[in-house]
Amino acid sequence: MLHEQSVELLNKAVADELTAVHQYMYFHFQCDDQGYDLLAGLFKRSAIDEMLHIERIAERILFLGGDVELLANATVKKIHDVKMMLA
């Protein structure tokens, strides 16, 4: 029972991380399109960092005998204003 609860919580963490990956990549695309190359790169790097977090969490889920669920828990916020992205 404890492992099942742990896997459930870890899968929620995976969902949060996936949501962050999607958001950071959306910001990356928007900044890249607007010519903010440095900021675009920072958002892309942040997305990659989140993917590495997912990898570590997934390893723990598998170690506990669980199944990794790759489902984001929120939709991407469609923000085009760079200042709002940083708020």
Predicted regions and their residues:
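Iron-associated oxidoreductase/ferritin-like identity signal
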Residues: M1-A87
